[in-house]
């Protein structure tokens, strides 16, 4: 994103359809690993209630957030709350607020839940529209000490609202960040059986929920959409002089930005409000 619980076993299917590997295709014949669920937020609660404060904190302000974003992030229920149906709703609105023309929300698990190696996933329905920028991402917990990009960043899912059929998974660290980050696009796939009515296709991503995931290993990171691996980065193939900070603790960030260099400003075609719905966020560790 930045440019400048219930214990149970989970068997992950490593589907290879749509596989696009950054740097090297490797391990396609590996056996699927078995993951144990360690932590999750299922966003169950009364409509209008705040996300669980044991897990989530708010980023508040209208500083542009290093990306020339246009919104003011708030902690108001109008911008972030549970919807009463088991979803977290993050809503971007067009309204004057604290000198900005838009409001939205950005929440994080900093100092509440931070982990290193493992599998992170979320089931999300993204919003759409010119200038709308939803994201599910991880930031290194040592950001206050070392800064960005040295802390590392994993963008599990970013979508440009004007192109809601395409999403990106990206790594940022020292030696590969901003415009030089290690990124890969994934285009929403419509199954042949859903090519015509009465089946309802799940594309673009704004039409329905999809599971976005990243598996962080000691020297390899894999990105998935709906169980399909489309992006893999290996530490041993990085250029000399780059860093690999991804074995250290990271925390989760969920947000909907408005405007910024990545997506551009909203225009007359953009409909407000725009809401990102999150069914759950989960973290797994490999079974021992």
Give the role of each language-model region.
Residues 29-288:
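GH16 jelly-roll
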Residues 24-27:
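C-terminal motif of bacterial Sec signal peptides marking the signal peptidase cleavage site
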Residues 2-16:
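Bacterial N-terminal signal peptides that target proteins for export
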